[in-house]
Every structure is written in structure tokens, then in C-alpha cells.
A protein has these predicted regions:
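Residues that define the transmembrane beta-barrel architecture of outer-membrane proteins
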Residues: 29, 78-85, 113-117, 167-171, ...
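Transmembrane beta-strands of outer-membrane beta-barrel proteins
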Residues: 31-39, 98-102, 131-133, 186-190, ...
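Outer-membrane beta-barrel "beta-signal"
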Residues: 175, 363-379
């Protein structure tokens, strides 16, 4: 089994797991640290393939994480695509009105290489109003903030039909207002900035394993509204930007022409007694480039002591400007989680990926049956 490429991740995680999160006070400043890890292994045990467009992958293949190039290939167990180790630290002033937060993540999908995911300053302007400046997670989806923290998620890997895009972070700033309106708790966030992603994992899946594509999102401007009351929660988001690509492996030295995109997202959640459910919907208008993207997710789960079964369905489809073949596929996922302690859990997940793309599609596609197990921990 090809576990060598994640050996560093496993070894470092094993050393750090026993350590609890901690805080240290020093000359009026408080330093805190914490971490998370996922040790996962999975295997594709059936499916279909189109040899002409496998893009250098040994398919049938299951894509668990588009943004990070998390791909399970046929023929053997793999530990890399979903395994990760993250460390987070922050320093805050004694009055709590100013803080600096950073987070780095080492991923098996990147052969253990660590990337800086967050590095931002927070200033509390009032009891309700907060401003943040630096590198942050782009709030595309409901689970965007926690998508690397396996323990915080009901899945081992989030449904890729929805949680799969070329950019997940941005450099910029946000202004957040939190308040309570009658019996409703809510927040409004306005944010903006830009992001340049070199050697995009997303585009390696589409352009080929040996390709290199750089991505740029500029003029990012978005608004997010979240509300909750009792058992119900809802979230809407709108993000606009310009997008550009540069296919470096083909010798391109400059980015393509800027194309405008507008992203719309809606999330609904319910948590009643032991039952919980979630619906999430995404619409991306990229008619300036190629067309439109649609994705949705429906999930229902049940808590029974330390056990938590979950069933979900996710669908993705395109509508193109021209007569090219649009991409269409969906996945059924069944997950069983067992909480070992208050900060650790094990999971087993079965995914059935059904490809509905018409013949003639030019990138990797096909059906896949995937089984994955994981151990998640926060510390």
C-alpha cells in the first residue's frame, strides 16, 4: 500500500495527539494553540472509465477533494487523499479586542507538504462589529470554515459535487456584524479581496496529472447572511469576482482574459432532538466564460449515543454556452460515525458516484464505488 508519502503526516500526528490545546500568558498577551488531524484510508472497488481521458490517473477514480487534488485511484488502498494534519495558533491582547490567528495544514494529497491556510488579524470595533484583515477562508459553503477539520464534519470527505472548486481562500478583509433580533441570532458579513493559486489541484484533475495551471480570482466582493433560531438555521451568500487561468505546462506566460462570475449559495439546516438534516444549493453564473454550474446537497442523520449514521445525496450539472458536452454526475453517501471520546471519532463511508456525462466529454469521468475509513481528532 502506498502509505510512504503520508509517513510524515502520520508520525507527526501521532506525536502531537496526546497534547491538549493550551494557553500561555506573557506580558499582557495570551498565546493559544490547538490542532486537528485525520488519518484516512480508502479504496475504489469498482466503476467505469474512459481510457482516452484518464488524464494520467489510473481509473476508475473517486475524487474526494477537487481543490486539493484528492483522488483515489483503482487497484490499491490509499492514505493520501483525505489524511491531513493542521496546527492553529493565536495571540490576543489582554482586553480581547485584538488578535492574530494563523493556521497551517499538511496534506497527504500534497505528499505531506504544509500550506498556510489562514493568517489574519481581528479587531473588535464594538460588541457587535468585528473587522478581519489577512488570509482567510472564502465562505463559499456552509462548512467552508471547518472543511479541513474532520472531527467537526459528519463525513470523511465532504460531498465533492458541491464542495469542489478551484479557490478556497482569499487575501483581503471582512466586516462582520453579529446581533440578536427578537428570538433570532444572526450575522452579516461583507468581504473582499483576491486570490492567486499556483498549480491548482482542481485543474490538475481536469487538465491532466502532469499539467500545471495557475488560477487568479480578482475583485472578489461578497455578502453572507446567517440566521438561526431554536432548531432551524439558514445561510445565504453572494460572491462576485473576475477569473483568469494560466496553463503553465503548455508554455503560457500570462493569464487569460478576465471573465466575470457570480456565485449564489443557500444553506438550510434543522436539528430536532436526535435528528438533523441539511440542504445546500449552489448556482454559479459564468456565462462570460463557459456557462452555468448547479450543485445541491441533501443530507439526513441521526444521533444515538456515540453513534451517528448519515445518508446524503449530492448532484452537480453544467449548462454550457455552446454545443460542448456538459459535465453531470451525482453521489450517494452513507456514513457511520462513532465518537470515541469528546475529541476523537472514527468513521466509515461508502460513496456511489454515478456519472451522467454524455459520451465525448474531454476530461476524466466515469462511475466509481469508494469505501473509506478514518480516525479524526482535535487537540
Amino acid at each position: 500500500m502506498p502509505f510512504r508519502r503520508t509517513a510524515f503526516l502520520f508520525a507527526l500526528g501521532a506525536q502531537l495527539c496526546p497534547l491538549p490545546s493550551h494557553a500561555v500568558d506573557l506580558q499582557g498577551l495570551e498565546f493559544t494553540g490547538s490542532g486537528f488531524m485525520t488519518l484516512a484510508a480508502g479504496r475504489v472497488f469498482g466503476g467505469t472509465r474512459d481510457v482516452a481521458v484518464d488524464q494520467g490517473f489510473h481509473c476508475p477514480c473517486f475524487i474526494s477533494d477537487y481543490a486539493q487534488r484528492g483522488v483515489y485511484e483503482a487497484g490499491h488502498w490509499q492514505a493520501g487523499p483525505d489524511s491531513k494534519l493542521g496546527l492553529q495558533g493565536s495571540v490576543s491582547a489582554a482586553d480581547g479586542r485584538f488578535s492574530l490567528t494563523g493556521q497551517a495544514v499538511s496534506r497527504g494529497a500534497a505528499n505531506g507538504a504544509a500550506n498556510l491556510e489562514w493568517l489574519y488579524a481581528t479587531v473588535e470595533l464594538s460588541g457587535n462589529l468585528t473587522v478581519q484583515l489577512g488570509r482567510k477562508r472564502l465562505p463559499l459553503f456552509s462548512y467552508s470554515e471547518a472543511q479541513d477539520v474532520g472531527y467537526a464534519l459528519p463525513w470523511i470527505h465532504l460531498p465533492p459535487q458541491l464542495y469542489g472548486w478551484e479557490v478556497v481562500n482569499y487575501d483581503g478583509g471582512s466586516l462582520v456584524w453579529r446581533d440578536q433580533w427578537a428570538q433570532w441570532n444572526g450575522s452579516v458579513q461583507v468581504f473582499g479581496g483576491s486570490e492567486t493559486r499556483k498549480d491548482s489541484g482542481f485543474w490538475r484533475i481536469y487538465n491532466g496529472r502532469s499539467s500545471r495551471t495557475d488560477v487568479r480570482w480578482s475583485d472578489i466582493l461578497g455578502t453572507e447572511l446567517s440566521v438561526s433560531r431554536d432548531w432551524f438555521s439558514a445561510r445565504v451568500v453572494r460572491i462576485q469576482s473576475h477569473t483568469q487561468n494560466k496553463l503553465v505546462s503548455l508554455g503560457e506566460t500570462s493569464f487569460s482574459e478576465r471573465k466575470r462570475q457570480v456565485i449564489h449559495g443557500l444553506s438550510l439546516g434543522a436539528d430536532v432532538d436526535n435528528w438533523f438534516a441539511r440542504g445546500e444549493f449552489l448556482y454559479i453564473d459564468r456565462r462570460d466564460d463557459y456557462g452555468k454550474d448547479y450543485a445541491n446537497l441533501l443530507a439526513i442523520g441521526y444521533r444515538h449515543g456515540p453513534w451517528q449514521p448519515l445518508l446524503s445525496r449530492a448532484i452537480y450539472r453544467q449548462r454550457l454556452n455552446n454545443d460542448s458536452v456538459p459535465e453531470r454526475h451525482g453521489t450517494w453517501s452513507a456514513v457511520l460515525r462513532y465518537d470515541l471520546t469528546d475529541d476523537s471519532a472514527i468513521k466509515a463511508q461508502l460513496d456511489l458516484w454515478k456519472d451522467r456525462t454524455a459520451p465525448g466529454y474531454g476530461s476524466m469521468h466515469g462511475d466509481a464505488r469508494q469505501f473509506t475509513v478514518s480516525y479524526d481528532r482535535v487537540f
